Design a protein with these regions (language model features):
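Juxtamembrane intracellular "pre-TM" segments in multi-pass secondary transporters
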Residues: 2-7, 182-219
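C-terminal transmembrane helical hairpin of 12-TM major facilitator-type secondary transporters
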Residues: 279-323
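Helix-loop-helix hairpin linking two adjacent transmembrane segments in secondary transporters
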Residues: 136-179
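Short amphipathic helix-loop junctions that connect adjacent transmembrane helices
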Residues: 29-43, 233-249
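Conserved MFS/SLC helix-loop-helix module at the cytosolic interface between two early adjacent transmembrane helices
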Residues: 57-96
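Cytoplasmic helix-loop-helix junction between adjacent transmembrane helices
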Residues: 102-141
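Helix-to-loop junctions at the C-terminal end of transmembrane segments
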Residues: 60-71, 264-278, 362
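Helix-breaking motifs and short loop linkers at transmembrane-helix boundaries and internal kinks
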Residues: 39, 71, 92-97, 244, ...
């Protein structure tokens, strides 16, 4: 039996998520260049993102249900080990098929954040939960801030170098979790062996929306993620077409975005949440996000990107953890893993749809179209959340 630790479980999960996202941030911006190295084009590079999201859509609910049955720690360790193997395969890949297999494996075992959010729900009280979710968001932002810069620097020595280092980082995370990370879900709170329905993404997505206390909040989260999901892949094209930015400028800008995410979710959110509450932050954050996305669509000078996207980081940084915590409050302890797994599947669904919407609107309508679309979707998410939070009591559901 492992000795109980005197450190906060939140610190452990923060380190786990940060190290995981550090490796992710090192590799993902370089994927188009891995494809180019094998004579692939933009279509193949875009297909990689869709494949990753599709694999997460299939595996997300199963990972959540398995963590409810067997505990968060073993599931998290298996996911991290799968990530390490995927990065190793990517570094060694000598064909497009090998690259696709690596991304497929990474997507299937990409339940790290799903399990991390369930872990947070296990170790925090209802009042502390949104701050715990915000801490995960801060680790996410910090990893994505440092990862792309480190990956870009190392890629000067060859594209495979960042992939191999990301593999080593993921393996170190496995060792950290094996010897240091405590289990968060006691045996008495675990569920029975999951039925086939619990491992089926489509069935679990339908089950996810069935409980009335969380249905409309989940619709709001889905709409919010749909507003965002296509913009990450579209922004470099937008900034190049409108402002003439190159890859270096985009890299600096994404580091700035990561810094904003860390400051908002790691510092500001923890201070402001007890003062304003999750409901106000969810609604207010969605309003700021809708305004910021409209600002991106209207901008004609590149310096405006920094304050406007900073506003978007503020809006998303307070609304996403608040909505996640509000949904989590309405689900009992035995259903947290299924909730987070279903939520990850929901996110993956938007990651399949969103990039296509952004790409088509960008090419057919104009450079600002994806951001107008995102602004409208954020406004719809705001309206749905406002109505749901005004009328729904916090009644717990088993999911």
């Amino acid at each position: 039996m492992r000795k109980p630790t005197r450190f906060s479980p939140l610190l452990f999960i923060f380190i786990t998520v940060f190290v995981d996202l550090l490796g992710y941030g090192m590799v993902v911006p370089l994927l188009p260049f891995f494809v180019q190295r094998q004579q692939g084009g933009a279509t193949a590079a875009g297909a990689l993102g869709s494949l990753y999201a599709l694999m997460q859509l299939i595996s997300g609910p199963a990972i959540g249900a398995l963590s409810d049955r067997y505990g968060r720690r073993p599931v998290l360790l298996v996911c991290l080990l799968g990530t390490a193997m995927a990065y190793l395969m990517l570094g060694l890949a000598g064909s497009l098929a090998a690259i696709f297999l690596a991304i497929m494996l990474d997507g299937i075992t990409g339940g790290n954040l799903t399990t991390a959010y369930a872990y947070i729900a296990d170790v925090t009280s209802l009042d502390e939960r949104s701050r715990g979710m915000g801490l995960v968001g801060a680790a996410f932002g910090l990893g994505l801030m440092a990862g792309p810069a480190l990956g870009g620097l190392l890629s000067a020595n060859g594209l495979s170098v960042p992939a191999f280092l990301a593999c080593a980082i993921a393996l170190s995370n496995v060792i950290f979790g094996l010897f240091v990370l405590p289990e968060s879900l006691p045996v008495e709170r675990r569920t029975a062996a999951p039925a086939w329905r619990a491992l089926n993404s489509a069935a679990q997505l339908m089950d996810l929306f069935r409980p009335a206390p969380i249905r409309w909040l989940l619709v709001s989260i889905f709409t919010l993620n749909l507003a965002f999901s296509g913009l990450q892949t579209n922004f470099p094209l937008y900034s190049q077409a409108r402002f003439g930015w190159n890859t270096l400028h985009n890299g600096v800008f994404f580091a700035y975005v990561g810094t904003c995410a860390v400051l908002v979710q790691g510092v500001l959110f923890r201070w402001i949440q007890p003062r304003l509450g999750e409901k106000r932050l969810a609604v207010g954050g969605l309003g700021l996000l809708a305004l910021a996305l409209a600002g991106i669509a209207l901008a004609r000078q590149d310096w405006l990107m920094y304050p406007v996207v900073g506003l978007a980081a503020l809006g998303s940084g307070v609304s996403i953890p608040s909505l996640t915590a509000l949904v989590s409050r309405r689900v009992d302890a035995g259903g947290q893993g299924r909730l987070m797994g279903g939520s990850q599947a929901l996110l993956s669904l938007t990651m399949i749809i969103g990039p296509a919407l952004a790409g088509v609107s960008f090419e057919v309508i104009g450079t600002g179209a994806p951001y107008w679309l995102g602004s409208v979707l954020a406004a719809i998410a705001l309206w749905i959340a406002y109505v749901a939070l005004r009328s729904r009591p916090a009644i717990k559901s088993p999911v």
